[in-house]
Amino acid sequence: MKSQNKYSIRKFSVGASSILIATLLFLSGGQAQAAEKQVNMGNSQEDTVTAQSIGDQQTRENANYQRENGVDEQQHTENLTKNLHNDKTISEENHRKTDDLNKDQLKDDKKSSLNNKNIQRDTTKNNNANPRDVNQGLEQAINDGKQSKVASQQQSKEADNSQDLNANNNLPSQSRTKVSPSLNKSDQTSQREIVNETEIEKVQPQQKNQANDKITDHNFNNEQEVKPQKDEKTLSVSDLKNNQKSPVEPTKDNDKKNGLNLLKSSAVATLPNKGTKELTAKAKGDQTNKVAKQGQYKNQDPIVLVHGFNGFTDDINPSVLAHYWGGNKMNIRQDLEENGYKAYEASISAFGSNYDRAVELYYYIKGGRVDYGAAHAAKYGHERYGKTYEGIYKDWKPGQKVHLVGHSMGGQTIRQLEELLRNGSREEIEYQKKHSGEISPLFKGNNDNMISSITTLGTPHNGTHASDLAGNEALVRQIVFDIGKMFGNKNSRVDFGLAQWGLKQKPNESYIDYVKRVKQSNLWKSKDNGFYDLTREGATDLNRKTSLNPNIVYKTYTGEATHKALNSDRQKADLNMFFPFVITGNLIGKATEKEWRENDGLVSVISSQHPFNQAYTNATDKIQKGIWQVTPTKHDWDHVDFVGQDSSDTVRTREELQDFWHHLADDLVKTEKVTDTKQA
């Protein structure tokens, strides 16, 4: 009898417990749904439909499971309900505990919602953050979620069973799979961690706000159940990172489709920062041709390189000619830039006179359309106006200076320009007074204090026998001008700088008409060209018209590449002389005046050192103004060694050429301490 009573009491206890579980099922289920509605109020209607369809699917699966195990849940619930009133005290106590638990959950939900908003704001501020930093943040959030989950599990231990049953009807979008009832709690906990980490890593390549939402929802849904992989292999965060393109798949087809659709609807692609990529590419790119800022240059006054006779810049030169400033050895101007010196290559006429070239040099620096002057154009019979230059130093004026460095005839051209700036052109001034009209500021004079220094390299200040004996012959001039005429056609890019003489085909002019017109040009009988100015007569005329400026530093560099013959006083060309100059070098070496024989292949040493009628001194460390400072003659240096055009010369190396120009540029910077009027 006693055993029967014990059995009845045990049966009663089981029945009361079942009633309690059923009651908690309905109460907590309704309250959990209310809590989820509050948290997910902002979610789209699509999320709600998706979650409901998933819940329905899982409910059907649970029903099937119960039928397979022979459990009649409905009948069992009805039998237990009849005895509900037998233990009101226990039921009320459990109701109270359930209410307290739901309140705690609602508080946690509110905290999670606030944390979610904060994470979204932080993520918005750091959209351009390093992906590595984002990964670290996600891992930290996962760890925090795990810790929060353990604490939450301890608080809700009493209602664990009811939560597990209710989860099937209220499974949120963050966890799309479920666990089999046969799994124990430790397996459930492990699989919850894996799936939540998987979901976070799956969203990581997408919008960071979505990823942070999942971290927050991870804490809210810490009791949700997932179905394990068949092989039950433990996954780590690092494994998931390496397989972001193939995350853990849901076990059901409907779950897979619903999950993917929700991700597609809420995902926003995070595009690379294009500006950052461009800045990085620039930073890593080649810096060879980078131009330093004005404040970073060693020289205050720009250096302007002025080429000589038959000189061109690369954009207009015949293809058979090497780069003028450096040849194949180096680009002198670019090398100066790379080493902190602001420098330019002037582009002026290759065969024009010193006067025409000086005018062109002025406009090359200042900018504007070339005006050769009305009087000059009328005197020599060519066009008054020439090409238009953009200008490299548009603010060039008294007080704003430049360094002028001229090679060969370029040294004469520089001297002519300085004379025009300081004293103007008396002929142009008189012509303008008589005929009125405009006059270029260059010809008015009173433009002193615009040149800091004048440096010449192998310049025939007193002319050269090479031009006297060969260059000024009618046959030679005819050949050269014919070449200029040929390259003057409208389809040619080569420019000999003789357009003012008509040696440039007009756009609508046939080539036959162009040739006929050129034959009538005054160029063929004029002295207004480079051939004449390079003769000793032409150079002497320039020396009479020019003078030294007491405010300018003058310096000359001279080379020689000949040696005395064995049986005479004549000079013979050295073996390493630039081959085209061997003939002219030997001709000059036979000159009647012995002092003119030593030469660099084109220019005699005595002519390159200084103009005969102007003061000079040997160059020293002391910088002097208003006088030619003559540097020691550089032996075994021919006419083009100063500019590195002889690529076959193994004696003169690139390093030697580079050292020469660095030393020259450094000297120019030192002269600014003497010529800078701003310091006075």
From Swiss-Prot:
Record-level GO BP terms: lipid catabolic process
Enzyme nomenclature, EC number: 3.1.1.3
Residues at the active site: 408, 600, 639
Record key words, sorted: Calcium, Hydrolase, Lipid degradation, Lipid metabolism, Metal-binding, Secreted, Signal, Zymogen
InterPro entries the UniProt entry points to: AB_hydrolase_fold, Lip-like_C, YSIRK_signal_dom
Binding site for Ca(2+): 638, 641, 646, 649
GO cellular component, one term: extracellular region
Basic and acidic residues bias locations: 84-112, 224-234
Keyword DNA repair among record annotations: no
SUPFAM superfamilies: alpha/beta-Hydrolases (SSF53474)
Pfam families per record: Lip_C, YSIRK_signal
One Gene Ontology molecular-function label: metal ion binding
Record flagged with keyword Transmembrane: no
Biased composition (Polar residues): 40-58, 162-193, 204-223, 235-246
Residues that make up the propeptide removed upon maturation: 35-290
Bilayer-crossing regions: none
Top-level taxonomic group: Bacteria
Signal peptide range: 1-34
Intracellular or extracellular location(s): Secreted
Enzymatic reactions: a triacylglycerol + H2O = a diacylglycerol + a fatty acid + H(+)
PANTHER family cross-referenced by the UniProt entry: ALPHA/BETA-HYDROLASES SUPERFAMILY PROTEIN (PTHR34043), ALPHA_BETA-HYDROLASES SUPERFAMILY PROTEIN (PTHR34043:SF3)
Family assignment from sequence similarity: Belongs to the AB hydrolase superfamily. Lipase family.
Designated name of the protein: Lipase 1
The species this protein was found in: Staphylococcus aureus (strain MRSA252)
